[in-house]
């Protein structure tokens, strides 16, 4: 068996990336954003092709991400922020609801969304993970944007003339 294998493509040239950052836990979000922007640059994404917006907190990420996805101006989106456990049930609500919104937007629109919302127990944990998560989200966004483009169906009138992955020889089955 010799399967067709799509390898990860981390070339960000020509990609348009939208970033939504929650301002709650500002220091963490800023560290994530800086690392994310640096990594996008290393991957070849032009800074003019990146839009950054901020929202009050993690629960508001979904609204901004949805609007950006609906614009179809972006190849991928990135959500950044931090939810740090407190003494109430609020942590679970915010963590679960923000993650669900982010996933739903990606699935409903087909626009990849890298979820960089840290859910941690302490400020120290958030600080230790912020830069790494920001850079990771840049890589995820670029890879998934390229994968989505590679998996996009081609529009052609004569499918029998091309050599697409899904074309098989007619062996009478």
UniProtKB/Swiss-Prot annotation:
Domain of life (superkingdom): Bacteria
Location of the active site: 90 (proton donor)
GO terms of biological process kind: riboflavin biosynthetic process
Enzyme class: transferase
Coiled-coil residues: none
Listed HAMAP family: Lumazine_synth
Protein name: 6,7-dimethyl-8-ribityllumazine synthase
